């Protein structure tokens, strides 16, 4: 990159695939982690059901509800300005 951050979009992802570009994707469940990943030019941030094991202390992901995922996705969404 030339120092200018551009927002990653779904069409941009398609373009990356067509060009053989590797996509960087990491997981975040909280504002600070998502902000750091966004500032590090990570192209996609995943919020997944592993939040149940990582943040909630469950032994599996089965107890995670849709409301849990929505809650963490909203937090991550507030932190991210460039990543998808």
Regions found by a protein language model. Give the residues of each.
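N-terminal amphipathic alpha-helix/helix-capping segment at the start of soluble metabolic enzymes
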Residues: 1-27
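Alpha-helix-loop-beta-strand connector modules within alpha/beta enzyme cores
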Residues: 8-11, 58-84
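Hydrophobic faces of well-ordered beta-strands that scaffold small-molecule active sites
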Residues: 24-27, 45-47, 84
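Conserved, mostly hydrophobic/aromatic
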Residues: 26, 30, 37, 76
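Glycine-rich, proline-tolerant flexible connector loops at the mouths of alpha/beta enzymes
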Residues: 33-34, 44-70
